[in-house]
Structures are given as C-alpha cells and as structure tokens.
UniProtKB/Swiss-Prot annotation:
Tissue expression summary: Mostly expressed in developing seeds and apices.
Originating species: Oryza sativa subsp. indica
Domain of life of the source: Eukaryota
Protein name stated in the entry: Dehydration-responsive element-binding protein 1F
Matches recorded under SUPFAM superfamilies: DNA-binding domain (SSF54171)
Task performed by this protein: Transcriptional activator that binds specifically to the DNA sequence 5'-[AG]CCGAC-3'. Binding to the C-repeat/DRE element mediates high salinity- and dehydration-inducible transcription.
GO MF annotations in UniProt: DNA binding; DNA-binding transcription factor activity
Compositionally biased intervals (Basic residues): 23-41
PROSITE patterns: AP2_ERF
Subcellular location per the Swiss-Prot or TrEMBL entry: Nucleus
Chief place of localization: nucleus
Keyword vocabulary terms for this entry: Activator, DNA-binding, Nucleus, Stress response, Transcription, Transcription regulation
Length: 219
C-alpha cells in the first residue's frame, strides 16, 4: 500500500518534458524613444535647432552641449529666422566659429558673442542677435476719408485741410462809400470845364473848332 502511494506521488510530481517547438514566448515590442516623432514633425525643414510651436505661429530654439546630453534653451521667437540667429550664436559659443554648423555661414561676424560658455551668457547673446533681425511692423493703413470720425456732440470731425475763409471785400475797400463818392462825382462839373465855361461859350461853331456840349455837366 505504501509502495503504491509513493510511486503515484513521484509520478505526479514529475512533469512531462516539453517539446522544443511547443512553448509560447511573448516578445515585447521595441521600446520607442519618447518625443522623437513630435520633434521630427515640428522641426524647421531648413534651419538647425529650430522647432515650431503653437501651430507654427511661434518658433523655439535649443542646442545640445558638447560631450553632454543636456540642452540649452534659447527662447521662443515670432519668426524662424530669429530663432535660427539665436542658434548660430549658441553654436559659436559652444563649438567655436570653425567647428559650429551655422544656419547663416556667411554672417558670423555680424552676430554678438557670448562672454562665456555658460547657459546664461549664451541665452543673453542669442536674444540680442535675434532682436537685430526682428521684422519691423507693417505700416498702418490710413483711412480714405479723414472725416469719418465724429465728435461727442454728433458733429463731423474736422479734417487736416484748412477751412475756407470768407473775405469781406466791401468792408476792406469801403465799397458802399466809394460808390456813393463816385455817384456824387458824376453829378458835379469837372474842375477843368468849370474854369473855362465862358471861353467855351465864346467859341464859334465852325469846321475849324471842336464843339462840345457841356450841358451834360450842368445842374
């Protein structure tokens, strides 16, 4: 009886050997590096170290330190050109002008230089370089009609054109009085004729003398 129990227990404890091809092995998918896909989708197609943010309305820049995994954040800029200039300043500060891969290789001499290779000095020089290439704002469009605006009382606002000035010529030249003087003068006998009325009356009316009717000048 004991022999049977011992044999049954030993047989149950021994598991049958598994065949080489019968086992199931679950393979884990390869680990993906976090953030690389987003980096590829947002980086600028031309400029180094420049990525888009906020749907492409803003551009950020960062550079990797040599012999290190750390990155230096250089800021956010309104245009990719400004971010690219900031990258060039940082690249020159970290790798030197000859060893740096620049976005604008023809203009390193026009960029400000960082005092040291510390992240603070690099960020300061990068911001200064970006400001040198900030685009000026577009000019404001002037309204076609400058009288569109109205004042608080509802009256039309005056434009920059000078207002028409009324000149009273009658008041300046005293036209009413001048006309009265002319009228009175027409009713008087001219001085030259008044002195020689007797002589004119004595002149005979013939072909050799000119006859003048001076009754027009008499009252």
């Amino acid at each position: 009886m004991d022999t049977e129990d011992t044999s049954s227990a030993s047989s149950s404890s021994v598991s049958p050997p598994s065949s080489p091809g019968g086992g199931h092995h679950h393979r884990l998918p390869p680990k993906r590096r976090a953030g690389r896909k987003k980096f590829r989708e947002t980086r600028h197609p031309v400029y180094r170290g420049v990525r888009a943010r906020a749907g492409g309305s803003r551009w950020v820049c960062e550079v990797r330190e040599p012999q290190a995994q750390a990155r230096i954040w250089l800021g956010t800029y309104p245009t990719p050109e400004m971010a690219a200039r900031a990258h060039d300043v940082a690249a020159i500060a970290l790798r030197g002008e000859r060893g740096a891969e620049l976005n604008f290789p023809d203009s390193p001499s026009t960029l400000p230089r960082a005092r040291t290779a510390s992240p603070e000095d690099i960020r300061l020089a990068a911001a200064q370089a970006a400001e040198l290439y900030r685009r000026p704002p577009p000019p404001l469009a002037l309204p076609e009609d400058p009288q569109e605006g109205t004042s608080g009382g509802g009256a039309t606002a005056t434009s920059g054109r000078p207002a028409a000035v009324f000149v009273d010529e009658d008041a300046i030249f005293d036209m009413p009085g001048l006309i009265d003087d002319m009228a009175r003068g027409m009713m008087l006998t001219p001085p030259a004729i008044g002195r020689s009325l007797d002589d004119w009356a004595a002149i005979d009316d013939d072909d050799d003398h000119y006859h003048m009717d001076y009754k027009l000048w008499m009252d």
